UniProtKB/Swiss-Prot annotation:
Main subcellular location of this protein, as a coarse class: secreted
UniProt note on tissues of expression: Component of the organic matrix of calcified shell layers like nacre and prisms.
Cellular compartments annotated: Secreted
Signal peptide region: 1-22
Protein name: Mytilin-1
GO cellular component, as recorded: extracellular region
Keywords: Secreted, Signal
Domain of life (superkingdom): Eukaryota
Organism field: Mytilus galloprovincialis (Mediterranean mussel)
Length: 181
């Protein structure tokens, strides 16, 4: 799926804020290739993007305290951008992310789904909105939580395996190695 999208820690103080901005900007730069690959993977493996849409909707519908626990993954940052309506103080980061995402229509669909979740605040409503996806909301959330561990993703449902394949493909494109069982 969409390289599951999420990452933020609030740091108080001027130095901390600058560090957060720099770190988030670097994270956005690092996910460019992943987003491009994920857009292609989504297009080829989930033509309706219902599972991606449901996942993003469910993720955005989570209470803020739960959503904040997953802010270490790129999906969190992108979901935050999608649902914030531009109110965030760090507008340079948002402008950078929106510019990055502008060329990826499948990703845009996923971000629109995040907006739906932010509005409904109910994972069951999200599941009914994206009824073509065969996975339960909790299974999709588990996939997000496993993003950092490709080995775990490979052992999950087909949706998790597609994501793991995309991540592994990205590693091979940039000359990194990633192992899994």
């Amino acid at each position: 799926m969409i390289s599951k999208y999420c990452l933020f820690v609030i740091v108080l103080g001027t130095t901390g804020t600058a560090l957060v901005l720099t770190n988030d900007s670097n994270k956005l730069q690092n996910v460019k290739a992943v987003i491009a690959i994920q857009d292609k993977v989504l297009h080829f493996h989930d033509h309706t993007t219902d599972c991606v849409g449901e996942l993003m909707c469910i993720f955005a519908a989570l209470p803020e305290s739960e959503r904040n626990q997953t802010l270490s993954i790129p999906l969190g940052l992108l979901t935050t951008i999608a649902t914030d309506k531009g109110r965030d103080r760090y507008s340079s980061i948002y402008a950078e992310a929106k510019k990055l995402l502008a060329g990826y229509p499948t990703i845009k669909h996923a971000l629109n789904a995040a907006e739906n979740g932010h509005s409904t605040k109910d994972k069951n409503v999200c599941a009914s909105m994206y009824s073509k996806c065969p996975f339960e909301p909790d299974d999709l959330l588990d996939t997000i939580n496993d993003l950092e561990d490709i080995t775990t993703l490979f052992s999950k449902n087909v949706f998790g395996k597609v994501i793991a394949d995309a991540i592994e493909y990205n590693y091979t494109q940039v000359g990194m190695t990633q192992t899994h069982s």
